[in-house]
């Protein structure tokens, strides 16, 4: 292996980390069915105060991009940074790479007096102070979106799963609609907004849905239908290309993947990998059983819209609407895992899928943030301190387990 790769990536790490990033630097895993990748967005914050960084230097992003081998990049606002893993088949490699990327961008940010927070809303950031990234693409977006774009001080997690057949990919997207609220509940990490407790576990999507072309996917049955929709919008000058379709799930513009975009960014890496693994196993289940898409129609989508709201509001504590009456999140998850267990086993990620039960039982990042807030007597600084510690290490949870909100 060319030693310049190691020098370029600034590696003086363990053998396992060295092996992982060498693989990444030389092309990653071979792309196969159900291979996957994870994208995460972080807030850049002052390393001492943990206040969000409104303006950030170009050099920081150049250094982060160089340091990670091209896997860190700007986002729409200067306060944000995105990382993307390589394509993976082995879930353990994906976990280690995600840990590496977090440590690496935090290290680079530290050279500028900054660090990163993995949460979907910054507890004290004021969206009115946000500044767009000085790139033509983002300037055009801000010209179109105006205040809605400025309010987009939000970070999410996206998971790509490779599904080669285009029409079957759309069958999976349709069949996946009722499950999207489960991913929202498991990932919720945005209970605060503009220094206020919102009352929602996942406020991010409430703000994000102000943008056009968001929310749950439409009930398209084929790539041809989707292409007609995209063509109408692009020919009418509404958007330059299909990357401006910002649904909670969408087919990728550049890759043969189906991209889950609904989740909040997880504060804990293990939670992120668990949710990505559940999505991957479910995608395999639905891809191999395309007839399941036929069961998702207007009624099922309308119920999913309601459940999306309930997942945002109550997180892991919510009751989900079904035609047979209310069902707990834990029961919905148990049923889902029963359906996908053999697929998770085949993909080598059953243990990660099982971790979703722990999240549903004890809570997501939002619950731990709220616990830190209450145990500190309502100090938002305690919340950001916990997030900062948990983003790049296995931080201890607040002193007691999150209190369980009465289910509604």
Curated annotation (Swiss-Prot):
Enzyme Commission number:
6.3.2.2
* Keywords per UniProt: ATP-binding, Ligase, Nucleotide-binding
PANTHER family (alphabetical): GLUTAMATE--CYSTEINE LIGASE 2-RELATED
What family does the Swiss-Prot or TrEMBL record give for this protein? Belongs to the glutamate--cysteine ligase type 2 family. YbdK subfamily.
Q: Which reaction does it catalyse?
A: L-cysteine + L-glutamate + ATP = gamma-L-glutamyl-L-cysteine + ADP + phosphate + H(+)
Which Gene Ontology terms describe the biological processes this protein takes part in?
A: modified amino acid biosynthetic process
Q: SUPFAM superfamilies, per this entry? A: Glutamine synthetase/guanido kinase
- InterPro entries recorded for this chain? GCL_type2/YbdK_subfam, GCS2, Gln_synth/guanido_kin_cat_dom, YbdK
Question: What is the designated name of this protein?
Answer: Putative glutamate--cysteine ligase 2
- Give, as one word, the top-level EC class: ligase
Q: Which Pfam families match?
A: GCS2
Its lineage reads: Bacteria, Pseudomonadati, Pseudomonadota, Alphaproteobacteria, Hyphomicrobiales
Q: Which organism is it from?
A: Bradyrhizobium sp. (strain ORS 278)
Record GO terms (molecular function): ATP binding; glutamate-cysteine ligase activity
Its biological purpose is as follows: ATP-dependent carboxylate-amine ligase which exhibits weak glutamate--cysteine ligase activity.
Source species, domain of life: Bacteria
